[in-house]
């Protein structure tokens, strides 16, 4: 299962609105088929793995990070039917698909076809890998990650506005990897006017996976950019699983005040700025007690001279 989830994780940011599924077929202890959801969402991971395995799928075990689909599309039969027809003996899935078009129906097709089904292995890891898709199905909007590059004392720029570069090359390379795993990246009008950002991916081999660009602004449309008039417009992004917000203080504040941020990436540099621009303004909290319990620390590690801190929103808090 770990291999299947890893395959799907590589495809994150390329498959929306479909999930980034990974699949492995094992026959006699040997991996005979591998697949991940293709760019654009089709073909599905299971179909790719079945095509590679061919006749070796018969009586084999298929590991998939998500329940095989059960709905018929113009592009072909549902994956659950393909698996049953291929004669596999067993399917191990990490998660049931929350998409109402499947939602257990894929497992029913498999069982009706004589395929043994086990669910739950690797569930926690699969939820992390497909967090964007799962968030969109649950909340009706993309999973939103806020990226902040800060000094030790929490500043994003000097009083003059100068901010290039607070962090070093390793931290900036990690940001580009996050971009490659996002379907869309957003900045505010202030960042757009000050920096004219390209927001592309500049890592060798990943340049084709630069995300779509969005601008949070009530101004005139800008060619090559998708416009969001307010943070609440994210509920209209039905074809985006993962949204990365890279704007300045005003944009960060707007999304946090609207409680639309699911994950925060803080790239903290070992520098002191003193008087400077703060990362976030007023977000509606008037008591320290109300701030506690809303976020949990998920990760922390060094990136060259800098430090990455990852925080996840605790929903319901």
Segments from the language model and where they lie:
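Zn2+-dependent cytidine deaminase-like catalytic core
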Residues: 25-125, 253-256
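Short acidic, glycine/serine/threonine-rich loops at helix termini
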Residues: 74, 103-106, 130-131, 157-161, ...
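Generic alpha-helical structural signal
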Residues: 2-5, 111, 127, 131, ...
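Proteins enriched for Cys/Gly/acidic motifs involved in redox and nucleic-acid/cofactor modification
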Residues: 13-15, 42, 107, 121-149
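Structural motif corresponding to alpha-helix initiation and N-cap regions
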Residues: 43, 76-77, 123, 127-131, ...
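Enzymes that bind and transform nitrogen-containing heteroaromatic metabolites
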Residues: 1-16, 33-34, 52, 57, ...
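Helix-turn-helix
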Residues: 22
């Amino acid at each position: 299962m770990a291999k299947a989830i890893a395959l799907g994780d590589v495809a994150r940011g390329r498959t929306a609105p479909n999930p980034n599924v990974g699949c492995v077929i094992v026959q006699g202890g040997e991996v005979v088929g591998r697949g991940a959801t293709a760019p654009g969402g089709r073909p599905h991971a299971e179909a790719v793995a079945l095509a590679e395995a061919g006749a070796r799928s018969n009586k084999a075990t298929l590991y998939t990070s998500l329940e095989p689909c059960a709905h018929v599309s113009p592009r072909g039969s549902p994956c659950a039917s393909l698996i049953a027809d291929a004669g596999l003996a067993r399917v191990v899935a990490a998660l049931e698909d929350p998409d109402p078009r499947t939602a257990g129906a894929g497992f029913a097709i498999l069982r009706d076809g004589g395929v043994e089904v086990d669910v739950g292995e690797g569930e926690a890891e699969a939820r992390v890998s497909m967090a964007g898709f799962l968030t969109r199905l649950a909340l009706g909007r993309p999973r939103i990650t806020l990226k902040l590059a800060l000094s030790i004392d929490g500043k994003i720029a000097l009083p003059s506005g100068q901010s290039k570069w607070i962090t070093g090359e390793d931290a900036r390379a990690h940001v580009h990897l996050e971009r490659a795993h996002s379907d869309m990246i957003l900045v505010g009008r202030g960042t757009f006017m000050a920096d004219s950002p390209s927001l592309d991916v500049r890592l060798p081999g990943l340049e084709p996976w630069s995300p779509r660009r969005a601008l949070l602004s009530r101004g005139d449309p800008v060619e090559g950019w998708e416009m969001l008039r307010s943070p609440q417009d994210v509920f209209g992004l039905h074809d985006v699983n993962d949204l990365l917000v890279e704007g300045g203080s005003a944009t960060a504040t707007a999304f946090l005040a609207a409680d639309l941020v699911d994950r925060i990436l803080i790239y903290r540099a070992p520098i002191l700025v003193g008087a400077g621009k703060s990362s976030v303004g007023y977000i509606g909290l008037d008591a320290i007690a109300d701030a506690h319990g809303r976020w949990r620390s998920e990760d922390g590690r060094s990136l060259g001279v800098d430090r990455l801190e990852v925080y996840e929103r605790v929903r319901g808090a």
